[in-house]
């Protein structure tokens, strides 16, 4: 076991007297590079590195923006040497490995990929690799292929790969990941057939994140059929790379199918599919939807996402982006009823109108909380509404059409909403030619007044005012307090800013 040593002050060194297994357990709680450096203090500990079950290499916090390129290069080389040394030590001992975590800037991605087969041979359960880009994701990305061994592991339970220089997923044979429960792939390129192969080999998958995904458009069939059908899946996050979504078009016709009866949480950000073949989310509780149109779909303007929203209409919590609000305008007459929805959050945008919002609120008979991220879309100098190029109504009191106003007020007066929260109240649109502080804030106040004057069940309205000026807060406070009438018999209005918190109650 080795003799017990005394520290320089005469006290006993309790750690050195512990059994090897206990010391190894203690070292496993340290970042691996730190654990390796402790061998300078006690040579007896060095062999124990071979049996550490969790390897944690996080060097990201060590890179100072003020470092020179040469200092960064030397730091990266030193980091890679430490990882190589520890992996070699563990390979020699043929020890089992639970977790392999790497996060470092400035490391060549292909070098990191070479570590994957080494840890797979050790029966690793958890791989987490996060390598920020040195060039920026996009056209300059290298898209190194992920090693094929990673897709036939019999031990992997969790796999997370985030290479911001991009990674390529392409496996010749079958995929077999019988133990995999969590799969995160961020900044990856693959074709839809590879996605089908990947999902078919994950029979116990519970959490799937495919973020910043790029389809290999040139290799896609026509039409392109994408089916996500994993019975065990509970969490799904799917988004395509933002710049790719803004490109001209995804050329093949896309037919999309979701058959995930046990899914609880969905985050879906994409362009609208040409057709939703099947949408089945029987157990869905919370969803975040971000849909936008391709240039071709904007020209045709005949896209209908009714089937998709029919599939998620049983949610209790829903988040919609501003583009999704615009897309919903295509199915105002066929919008499903969200019977279970109690919490709705809407992100607003300066170019997006609210013409679909009255229809949406009308179809939420049990909605309790309504949250707006910003109050954008109207109040821009020389313009009446953010939907200037579209027909239809917008939930806006600036409209002179009394019939339209009557319809909107009728919709709001039947809403059961009890709480309205407005985040970033007072935030300007950000376009210099349209920005007018007084006009923007006055318009946002007018919208809040409309809620107060027409919604009878309101119990609380909270404005999170985006201003450091207390005087601005006081102005809004006084204007709202002077309202001659409100629809609710008892409604509290609260204004929260950086410095003060004001509230009053209508009685």
Swiss-Prot record:
Q: Which CDD domains match?
A: F-box_AtFBL13-like
UniProt keywords (A-Z) are:
Leucine-rich repeat, Repeat
Show me the LRR repeat boundaries. 135-163, 187-212, 214-240, 317-348, 349-374
Name-wise, this protein is Putative F-box/LRR-repeat protein At4g00320
Domain named F-box is located at: 12-60
Keyword Repeat belongs to the record: yes
Q: Does the keyword Repeat apply?
A: yes
């Amino acid at each position: 076991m080795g003799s017990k040593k005394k520290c320089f002050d005469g006290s006993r060194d309790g750690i050195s007297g512990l059994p090897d297994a206990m010391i190894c357990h203690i070292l496993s709680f340290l970042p691996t590079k730190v654990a390796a450096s402790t061998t300078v203090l006690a040579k007896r500990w060095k062999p124990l590195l071979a049996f550490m079950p969790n390897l944690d290499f996080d060097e990201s916090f060590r890179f100072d923006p003020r470092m020179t390129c040469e200092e960064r290069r030397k730091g990266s080389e030193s980091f890679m040497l430490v990882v190589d040394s520890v992996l070699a030590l563990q390979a020699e001992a043929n020890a089992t490995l639970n977790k392999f975590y790497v996060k470092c800037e400035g490391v060549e991605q292909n070098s990191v990929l070479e570590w994957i087969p080494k840890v797979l041979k050790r029966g690793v359960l958890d791989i987490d690799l996060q390598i920020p880009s040195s060039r920026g994701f996009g056209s300059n990305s290298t898209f190194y292929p992920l090693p094929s061994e990673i897709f036939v592991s019999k031990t992997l339970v969790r796999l997370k790969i985030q290479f911001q220089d991009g990674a390529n997923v392409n496996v010749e044979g079958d995929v077999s990941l019988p133990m995999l429960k969590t799969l995160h792939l961020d900044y990856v390129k693959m074709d839809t057939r590879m996605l089908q192969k990947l999902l078919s080999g994950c029979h116990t998958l519970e959490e799937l994140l495919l973020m910043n995904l790029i389809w290999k458009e040139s290799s896609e069939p026509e039409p392109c059929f994408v089916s996500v059908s994993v019975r065990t899946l509970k969490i799904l996050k799917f988004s395509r790379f933002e710049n790719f979504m803004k490109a001209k078009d995804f050329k093949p016709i896309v037919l999309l199918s979701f058959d995930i009866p046990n899914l609880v949480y969905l985050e879906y950000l994409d362009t609208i599919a040409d057709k939703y073949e099947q949408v089945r989310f029987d157990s869905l509780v919370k969803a975040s939807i971000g849909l936008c149109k391709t240039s071709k779909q904007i020209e045709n303007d005949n896209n209908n996402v009714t089937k998709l929203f029919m599939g998620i209409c049983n949610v209790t919590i829903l988040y919609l982006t501003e583009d999704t609000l615009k897309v919903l305008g295509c199915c105002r007459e066929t919008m499903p009823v969200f019977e279970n929805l109690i919490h709705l959050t809407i992100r607003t945008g300066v170019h997006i109108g609210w013409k679909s919002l009255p229809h949406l609120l009308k179809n939420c008979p049990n909605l309790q909380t309504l949250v707006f991220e910003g109050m954008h879309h109207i109040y821009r100098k020389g313009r009446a509404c953010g939907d200037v190029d579209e027909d239809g109504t917008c939930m806006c009191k600036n409209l002179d059409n009394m019939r339209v106003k009557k319809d909107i007020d009728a919709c709001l007066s039947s809403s059961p909403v009890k709480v309205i929260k407005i985040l970033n109240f007072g935030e300007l649109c950000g376009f210099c030619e349209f920005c007018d502080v007084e006009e923007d804030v006055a318009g946002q106040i007018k919208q809040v007044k409309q809620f107060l004057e027409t919604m009878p069940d309101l119990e609380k309205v909270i404005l999170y005012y985006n201003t450091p000026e207390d005087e601005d807060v006081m102005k809004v406070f006084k204007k709202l307090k002077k309202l001659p009438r409100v629809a609710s018999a008892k409604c509290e209005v609260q204004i929260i800013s950086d410095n003060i918190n004001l509230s009053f109650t209508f009685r």
